């Protein structure tokens, strides 16, 4: 179910509240999953819709919940997650960020997780990252890199991060596993995006379209040829000899 893909991914982002809108079953299991996964430190809230909401819309209820969460929890952003029933009846929460912009001063993201259009959690993960580009700012000067798609702890221990730090390459954001909303808003000043998981490809493509930031896709599979070619591209773009650091033979690649 894409709902759980969103919970898996978006809950990494610091001080961002998730508001799940759906039946009591959807909201309960989403909250329960997040609560146990994060040992009670999650920021997942529920708006359980009733029969009257199906008939007359739950939009007012969702807006009220958002305002209450902002008042009591002071999050840096809110992600509204629409599930199957709201999608079936045609509820459209995508306009919430515009209708609330005069009342709240934080980003309000909206992610649709209708299970009847897909049969996996991966689309939810991808959508929850892709929507983040809507909060990014425009910058003239480009510097450093972003890591997109890393969703485990201890990113500092990865080979990629160690190499970047060794050569004093600025790391603007690691999305989603180690970032704040401010990091996300400033991620568009990067010179390059390094994608380490396919769930972040849609985000990388969106950033390419909006901000003309190129990306390199490493993938998570251990393929030496792919790794070597990607480090060769990195060396070309960032003007650093990563291949020598790794003891890899130089290869000829075409950089876009």
Question: Model-derived features: where do they sit?
Answer:
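An N-terminal assembly and electron-transfer interface module characteristic of large anaerobic redox
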Residues: 1-256
């Amino acid at each position: 179910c894409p709902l759980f893909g969103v919970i898996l991914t978006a809950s990494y982002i610091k001080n961002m509240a998730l508001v799940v809108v759906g039946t009591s079953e959807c909201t309960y299991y989403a909250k329960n999953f997040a609560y146990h996964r994060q040992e009670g430190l999650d920021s997942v809230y529920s708006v359980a819709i009733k029969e009257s909401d199906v008939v007359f819309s739950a939009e007012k209820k969702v807006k009220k919940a958002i305002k209450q969460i902002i008042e009591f929890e002071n999050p840096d952003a809110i992600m509204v997650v629409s599930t199957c029933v709201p999608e079936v009846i045609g509820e459209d929460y995508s306009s919430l960020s515009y209708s609330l912009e005069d009342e709240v001063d934080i980003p309000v993201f909206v992610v649709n997780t209708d299970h009847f259009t897909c049969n996996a959690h991966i689309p939810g993960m991808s959508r929850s990252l892709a929507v983040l580009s809507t909060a990014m700012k425009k910058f003239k000067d480009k510097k450093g890199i972003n890591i997109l798609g890393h969703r485990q702890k201890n990113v500092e221990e990865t080979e990629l991060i160690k190499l970047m730090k060794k050569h004093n390459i600025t790391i603007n954001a690691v999305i989603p596993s180690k970032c704040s909303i401010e990091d996300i808003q400033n991620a568009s000043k990067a010179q390059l995006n390094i994608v380490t998981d396919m769930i972040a490809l849609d985000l990388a493509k969106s950033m390419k379209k909006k901000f003309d930031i190129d990306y390199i896709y490493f993938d998570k599979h251990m393929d030496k040829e792919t790794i070597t070619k990607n480090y060769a591209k990195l060396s070309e773009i960032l003007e650093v000899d990563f291949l020598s650091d790794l003891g890899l033979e130089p290869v000829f690649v075409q950089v876009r």
